[in-house]
Amino acid sequence: MPLLPSLILAFGISSSVQAALSGYAPVPATCPSTPLVRSATGISASESSYISSRAPVASAALGAWLTKVNSAFSTANLPAVALTTSGGGLRSLLTGAGVIQALDSRDSNAGTSGLYQGLTYQAGLSGGGWLLSSFAGNNYPTISNLETTLWTTAFADSLLVPENLEAGGAYAQISDDVVAKNAAGYPPTIVDVYGRLLAYQLLKGTDGGVAIELSSITGFSNFTGHNVPFPIITSLNVETATGVCTPPNNTVIYEFSPYEFGSFDSGVNAFTQTKYLGTSLSNGSPTKTTCETNYDNLGYILGTSSDIFNELCTTFPLVADVPGILANISAIVAQTHALTFMDEYATYPNPFYKYTHSTLVQAQPELTLVDGGESHQNNPSSPSSSPPAASASFW
């Protein structure tokens, strides 16, 4: 299968060394003492603790804004409020960013300024997930700061433009990342490359913020200080084993948060710890002596939430037959294996394999996930309405 000539490969390096050299590849780690899987009887203890600490901060800010608007407004029993940002690619990111800027007291003098500080939850999918990932993954700077220090340059020189990708060193680095993930025992798909390309535009740091995992947000100062709403990104399940390519309207909605991944939907009804995504589990217990970390790379997750490659719904064509940026992406993955239709999906070792409560997916060793808006619910309101989350939401 033909490869682009600019690829830089490390064929002479052992697979274990390749994995160790990359910040993208999953890494073995000691398993936690707490259970890795729980049934979805409510939100996790960690999320509950965060919300308990966030609630008085959010209520004070919301009450201050309401009395600023109307001094007679009663603030005795305020609801928890959630902000959601829909899919829509870059347009959604930019319009959603404008909304946040107008609501953020650090960044605006508009009449709506201060409402962001009153939020308890924030959710996004697809383009909205890009926004939330960029905001949370960079420790919640102002939108103005992201615009001037990252987005303006990154969007102008987008790596999703083939000429830009081939001209810079990012192409070789992303290639190395994907090869390292494969060397660690996790075959990559085109979503890995896609997520890495997006991360270069949305996350600060070396190699497109490769060291930023979703779970690492729990250590960021604005999160530990409970200064920000609790973030959730959504994605959809596709039962590829049944021969379908796209999710039905009633498909399972998966939630990614800094603490957990899973779903309240019947058929899954379970959650696992985000930090240990990638760990081989059977009925909730590890099948090996170690667990895996780094699988929750934030670039991969924001790529998962915006994965529409499954809409091709066909056996993956040869690299030479694919136009534009998809040819570049395909060529990188083709270094590791012959492409199939499964490369159109974001794949995750199924943490609910043989788990009693997850009847829909308990027989599947792998989950195949796609864009969170493909089931015609383009706004991620589900996390905000799942008990006992927010009692009100707006977008």
Say what each PLM segment does:
Residues 16-89, 107:
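Signal-peptide-cleavage-adjacent N-terminal segments of secreted and extracellular proteins
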Residues 82, 86, 90-96, 105-107, ...:
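Patatin-like phospholipase A catalytic core
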Residues 379-395:
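A short alpha/beta connector and helix-capping loop motif
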